Amino acid sequence: MVSRSGCVRSKPLPEQSRRVDRIKLNMSDKATAFDFSKGIALHRMGEKLAGPYFKWQFSQVAPYVGRRVADVGCGLGNMTEFLLDRDIYLGIDTCEEFIEILQTNHNRASNVKTIIADVLDDSFPTILQKNDIDTILSFNLLEHLEDDRRAAVNLVKSLPRRGYLLLLVPATPCIYGALDRWDGHFRRYTKQTMRNLFAALPVQIEKLHYFNCIGALGWWMKGRCAPSPEHSEYDYKLMNLCIPVLSRLERIISPPIGLSIVTIARVI
């Protein structure tokens, strides 16, 4: 299964597997077998239709992005186009196929570099330190990792003092359902679980907020009421219609829940 964390999806934690069983999802293990070509096709459809959504996601962290950026769990590069003006963009993923496609798409950009690396490896911080990275952006990665605490430690170690760690992860555990299982999510987060994740680490959380409250309802409906492992063209178009109003509203009123949580953390 294609995910931002790599080519092969992980299995959810036992307690979340039981939760999924209780809502009687008609999805067998065979139905979630890895199909790279199908995953790429779905991603490209999403990339074409979800441009406004990716832009909205990036706007949540844009003021904090430095000049030398590592995109950890870059996948096929949803955020790459917003970072092409940086001194260096370093795309990092565990999936060789993703990295090859990202390289091909941006082979004329001298500031775009890519590395196949795993955030859980002890050597990971050294890789980023050698590239003088001042900002780490990581969207929709931590939920794919069973040991997300180890990933958090390595991400913090990778940055210099006053460097920024910019994260976006799935939020609102009560909406965990078919889409999460299909995409290999171990969990969804709350503000408190994000604080706990970085407890005792040398970081200051400067901002922590929910993002896309309407999307949480749509995720719940698609994952619980009518389980489906795929986003349709209609789903993307409906979200694009909502973005202009919803983005303005969430700038005025911070939503109490959301599809995602955005975390802005600075190394101290």
Residue map of PLM features:
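S-adenosyl-L-methionine-dependent methyltransferase catalytic module, highlighting the catalytic core
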Residues: 36-37, 41-56, 64, 78, ...
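Conserved N-terminal segment of class I S-adenosyl-L-methionine
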Residues: 23-131, 135-139, 149-152, 232, ...
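Cationic, low-complexity basic patches in intrinsically disordered or flexible, solvent-exposed regions
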Residues: 12, 16-17, 25
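A short His-aromatic
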Residues: 140-144
